[in-house]
From Swiss-Prot:
Pfam families: tRNA_Me_trans, tRNA_Me_trans_C, tRNA_Me_trans_M. Disulfide bonds join 99-195. This is tRNA-specific 2-thiouridylase MnmA. GO terms for molecular function: ATP binding; tRNA binding; tRNA-uridine 2-sulfurtransferase activity. It is an enzyme of class 2 (transferase). The keyword ATP-binding applies. Keywords: ATP-binding, Cytoplasm, Disulfide bond, Nucleotide-binding, RNA-binding, Transferase, tRNA processing, tRNA-binding. InterPro entries: MnmA-like, MnmA-like_C, MnmA-like_central, MnmA-like_central_sf, Rossmann-like_a/b/a_fold. One of its GO terms (cellular component) is cytoplasm. It catalyses: S-sulfanyl-L-cysteinyl-[protein] + uridine(34) in tRNA + AH2 + ATP = 2-thiouridine(34) in tRNA + L-cysteinyl-[protein] + A + AMP + diphosphate + H(+). It comes from Xanthomonas oryzae pv. oryzae (strain MAFF 311018). Residues 94-96 are annotated as: Interaction with target base in tRNA. It is found in: Cytoplasm. GO terms for biological process: tRNA wobble position uridine thiolation.
Length: 378
């Protein structure tokens, strides 16, 4: 068996299958490596075995060696423990970002290099370019599928060793390629949601690790209107799962989460989807990371996303002395959520990002006792 020049992360899905197929057409020695990042907990919801069988089948069709690595221990310590700690603190984390940084482009990369590979390839919808002596992370050609948001924590050494073979493809084109190439995954549905939860109920899953703690649901005036099983089960702007029945003297309209008081275990709701209590024009972030290793300037204009697939929002970025980032948006943003990722763009280029720490949304600012100043950026 020849030493592979490139190891492809084969997930058992159509995207990684076509990524492997494209590389196979180039004639370089390649191999597939399947990562198991979550141990089967006996619930019957883990699809890892089905995905592994599909990955083996794809490797067989393409005539490339198949390898397997179990990274469930690394995932637990590097991703899942952080996930639980963030929810316990009342924040809403983004485990996919951390998984890419800590597992897929760290432990997987190490495993590929141990096999003798020079580079790795994955089925992400993103692109890499080398300009001005630096590696740049670019959006995928299919804007609806673009995954640069989840890859913004990657650095120069990782990008230098990474290929994104399907980054220039539209999803419809990719499906056609998979079908015409006879890949067994050509009609397989895309995976959705958090990988370790699968099709399970999120609240039931989280309740295994964070016991329910009943508290009050209040309106913005502080009137008690219902009970909740735990503030950590909810995120800002959420409508589903509140289970608020008819409230005397209130319209029969949906309720939305507008604030969480973690210390008092109180959830605040409003019937206005676009409540002023959910609006913010400023945010403070932490753990900033720049793809090229440094920000473009101490203060600069760009666009931002505070959640995946959000339209680009024009903003001004102010890099603080401690490396944290403050952002001023040109227009108010709805339900900007602490714990989620702020990702910054200059056109098609992903500059980097950070973790949202606080905003100037009125109720959240009051509950957090924030000293955040909207006078920092003029």
């Amino acid at each position: 068996m020849s030493t592979p020049h490139i190891v492809v992360g084969v997930s058992g899905g159509v995207d990684s299958s076509v990524a492997a197929w494209k590389l196979a057409q180039q004639g370089e020695p390649i191999a597939g490596l399947f990562m198991q990042n979550w141990a089967d907990d006996g619930s019957g919801d883990c699809r890892a075995e089905d995905d592994r069988r599909d990955a083996v089948a794809v490797c067989g069709v393409l005539g490339m060696p198949f390898h397997f690595r179990d990274f469930s221990g690394e995932y637990w310590s590097g991703v899942f423990e952080h996930f639980l700690a963030e929810y316990a603190a009342g924040r809403t984390p983004n485990p996919d970002v951390l998984c890419n940084r800590e597992v897929k482009f760290k432990h997987f990369l190490d495993a590929a290099q141990a096999l003798g590979a020079e580079r790795i390839a994955t089925g992400h919808y993103a692109q890499v370019a080398h300009r001005g002596r630096r590696w740049r992370l670019l959006r995928g050609a299919d804007r609806d599928k673009d995954q640069s948001y989840f890859l913004h924590q990657l650095g120069q050494s990782q990008l230098a060793a990474t290929l994104f073979p399907i980054g220039d493809l539209e999803k419809s084109t990719l499906r056609r390629i998979a079908r015409d190439a006879g890949l067994p995954t050509h009609a397989k549905k895309d995976s959705t949601g958090i990988c370790f939860i699968g099709e399970r109920d999120f609240r039931e899953f989280l309740g295994r690790y964070l016991p329910a703690r009943t508290g009050e649901i209040r309106d913005p005036q502080g009137q008690r209107i219902a009970e909740h099983p735990g503030v950590f089960y909810f995120t800002l702007g959420q409508r589903e799962g509140l289970n608020i029945g008819g409230v005397r003297g209130r319209a029969a309209a949906p309720w939305y989460v507008v604030g969480k008081d973690v210390a008092s275990n109180v959830l605040y709701v409003d019937q206005d989807r676009d409540s002023p209590l959910l609006q913010s024009r400023w945010l403070q972030s932490e753990q900033a990371h720049w793809v090229t290793g440094a920000p473009p300037a101490r203060r600069f204009s760009c666009t931002a996303q505070t959640r995946y697939r959000q339209p680009d929002e024009p903003c001004t970025v102010d890099v603080q002395d401690d490396g944290s980032v403050q952002v001023h948006f040109e227009r108010p943003q709805r339900a900007v959520t602490p714990g989620q990722s702020l990702v910054l763009y200059d056109g098609k280029e992903c500059l980097g990002g950070a973790v949202i720490a606080a905003t100037d949304a009125p109720l959240e600012r009051q509950l957090a006792g924030s000293s955040f100043s909207s006078e920092v950026v003029a």
